[in-house]
Regions:
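Interhelical loop and helix-boundary elements at the membrane-water interface
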Residues: 1-19, 78-92, 121-141
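Alpha-helical transmembrane segments and their membrane-interface exit regions
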Residues: 1-2, 21-24, 64-73, 114-125
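Helix-coil boundary and interhelical linker segments in multi-pass alpha-helical membrane proteins
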Residues: 23-59, 100-109, 148-153
């Protein structure tokens, strides 16, 4: 079907994939606590969401989602949608918005997210021809930094 051509590269497809991957944090948290689920007090006998009784897995999931959703926007701005002013503005705006919540959780996370916001604003303008390999290397470095900070959070 023509409408679905290249749908595997759509923003919606990427967002759903990122959401599913980030939700695995909750699955792992539940598995690491022998199920980690319990019934809500007002609904005895029903299994609740993994980690529903603990805030940390949800916090980690939210932070991972914030980072990887921004990555989708940034990479699309740099490769598939290079030169698209609306996609660029969306990417920069998104990155700026997530800085404050990240900083509230941990100032070091806030600093990382500020650096990512600056990157989303500066790199597409100053280095529009940067190679996909260089973009990927930057994402690897940012992911490792995020992972280290999340372990300390």
């Amino acid at each position: 079907m023509v409408l679905l051509a290249r749908a595997d590269r759509s923003l919606l497809n990427d967002a759903v994939t990122v959401l599913a991957a980030c939700l695995m944090t909750l699955v792992v948290a539940a598995a690491g606590t022998h199920g980690g689920t319990r019934s809500p007090p007002d609904l005895p006998g029903l299994t609740w969401l993994p980690g529903a009784d603990r805030a940390r897995p949800w916090l980690l999931t939210a932070l991972l989602l914030a980072y990887f959703a921004g990555t989708v926007l940034y990479v699309k701005t740099m490769i598939r949608d290079r030169g698209d002013g609306r996609r660029y503005a969306l990417s920069v705006a998104y990155h700026v918005v997530v800085c404050l919540p990240a900083a509230v959780v941990n100032p070091w996370l806030g600093l990382l997210f500020v650096a990512l916001a600056l990157r989303s604003a500066v790199v597409p303008k100053w280095w529009p021809g940067i190679t996909p390999a260089a973009i990927g290397a930057g994402e690897i470095a940012a992911s490792i930094t995020l992972g280290a900070l999340l372990l300390l959070t």
